[in-house]
Amino acid sequence: MDPQLPETDLVIFDCDGVLVDSEELSCRCLAEAMVKAGIEMSTERALELFLGRSTTALVDYCRGVGKPLPATFLPELAQQVRETFRSQLKPIAGIAAVLAELHLPYCVASSSDLERVKYSLELTGLASRFGPRLYTAQMVEHGKPAPDLFLFAAGRMRADPRRTLVIEDSVSGVMAAKAAGMKVWGFVGGSHYRLADGSALLKQAGADRIFAAMTDFWNEG
């Protein structure tokens, strides 16, 4: 038990927008790729629609607007995101210090695919902090906002959902954590929240606490 988190046995971190400052980068790549495929989209709109969601949500959206994605779309998008991350991705400021000070089991539960999570953590020097404790939407039937992924991660980590704390930056992620019966803190320090008021969105979704800098992680209240 960590004396600073007395009723918590496990901390689950989302990856994009919580560990790495990737949301604006990836949604910019997505918007550009969608426009190229003939689907109207902007970075801001992509953030509204797909923040914290899995690839399934993207595929379903495109089908819904009568523009099913070509077979080459997702592989080409993944490559573009990878190239963008290689030159521009940074860790969220202060996250390394939080992980170093955390004396509880912790893991990642992300809507991104496993290879992208691994790549993001390797680029930002965080991979060794998590080892194999990486759980993604590919591993469950229903992605966020369903609770499946967080319950799966807690099960793998042998933790009681009621004693699990989730750190999330998206509405769908906050909703998923609450549906899983977990405590959730909404983090709004990613660069994508320059474009929207994340605090109000995450609070409305059910976040138990909102904070905007990892230096405030331990300053609950």
Features from the language model and the residues they span:
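Helix-loop "lid/cap" segments that line or gate small-molecule binding pockets
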Residues: A33-M34, S54-P68, S120, A154, ...
